[in-house]
């Protein structure tokens, strides 16, 4: 009888212990649910998430901002600000110098939205990102795609204008003129095309050096450098090559054939370097003068584009040097 009572008491105490442990846990769980329901700060809302991403963007914490914009799009895909969030993702990458990632983000937007304010801006930013990557051909393709898809004359004219300046950047003057001429008459004053055409015509008088002539002149050591207006290099080349030639001649004249052969071998290397250096100097001279011309042209005539697609306008900014 005693043994039976023992078997009955043991399960009873086990049940009591387990029940007493479960009650606080269940109350804690229920309390946490009620706390989250009663505390609005713990609830993810579209406004809070978007504003948080905006604050990060304003603080120039671009990479974190991009992630928070992505989180906003993931949780609230039907929110009317999704397109803006996508654009800001692209801008976050662009402003942080990650141009290839920016291109991917902007392209994603242009595939999802058509002829909206931010899709058109995205086309422009894609071309600018490619320019920063020195991928000028890709920048031209992007803007030509915009020309094809848009039905807005103002947008098309701005694309033509941007294309023209890319061609100026790579010194393709005739192509630049061709695209500037495509701009409609109503926007010709907006982009100051008459003044631009007059300044662009000055490319014909950019100082140039002929690389072939520089090489031929270098038959006389230093003459090629002198032609390219590198006077110090011309003097050094003349003295060095002249000295080696004279030393080799003296060695052979005194029957020091080994020394003469060595000096001839060394001298030939310097002589070839004199020719190559002169040709390279001509190319550098031309690039430098072209860059100076492009810089002055941009400073004096380029319109500072600030897209205002709602009002169909641009902010015009000119700088003149005298």
Give, region by region, the residue ranges found by the protein language model.
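Short solvent-exposed coil/turn linkers within tandem alpha-helical repeat scaffolds
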Residues: 39-42, 73-82, 110-121, 147-156, ...
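Alpha-helical segment of the N-proximal tetratricopeptide repeat
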Residues: 44-78, 91, 95
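Hydrophobic alpha-helical membrane segments
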Residues: 84, 98, 118-121, 128, ...
């Amino acid at each position: 009888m005693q043994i039976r009572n023992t078997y009955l008491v043991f399960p009873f105490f086990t049940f009591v212990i387990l029940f007493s442990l479960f009650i606080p846990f269940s109350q804690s769980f229920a309390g946490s649910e009620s706390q989250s329901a009663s505390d609005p700060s713990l609830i993810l809302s579209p406004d809070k998430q978007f504003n948080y991403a905006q604050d990060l963007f304003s603080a120039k914490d671009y990479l974190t901002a991009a992630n928070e914009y992505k989180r906003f799009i993931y949780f609230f895909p039907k929110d009317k600000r999704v397109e803006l969030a996508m654009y800001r993702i692209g801008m976050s990458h662009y402003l942080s110098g990650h141009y290839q990632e920016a291109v991917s983000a902007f392209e994603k937007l242009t595939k999802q939205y058509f002829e909206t304010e931010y899709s058109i801006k995205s086309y422009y930013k894609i071309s600018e990102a490619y320019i920063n990557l020195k991928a000028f051909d890709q920048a031209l393709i992007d803007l030509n795609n915009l020309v094809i898809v848009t039905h807005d004359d103002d947008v098309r004219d701005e694309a033509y204008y941007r294309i023209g300046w890319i061609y100026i950047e790579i010194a393709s003057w005739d192509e630049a003129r061709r695209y500037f001429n495509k701009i409609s008459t109503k926007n010709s004053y907006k982009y100051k095309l008459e003044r631009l055409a007059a300044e662009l015509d000055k490319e014909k008088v950019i100082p140039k050096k002929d690389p072939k002539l520089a090489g031929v002149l270098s038959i006389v050591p230093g003459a090629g450098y002198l032609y390219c207006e590198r006077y110090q290099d011309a003097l050094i080349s003349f003295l060095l090559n002249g000295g080696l030639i004279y030393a080799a001649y003296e060695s052979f004249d005194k029957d020091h054939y080994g020394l003469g052969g060595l000096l001839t071998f060394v001298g030939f290397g310097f002589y070839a370097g004199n020719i190559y250096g002169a040709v390279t100097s001509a190319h550098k001279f031309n690039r430098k003068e072209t860059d100076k011309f492009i810089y002055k042209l941009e400073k004096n005539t380029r319109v500072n584009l600030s897209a205002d697609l709602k009002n169909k306008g641009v902010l015009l900014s000119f700088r003149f040097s005298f």
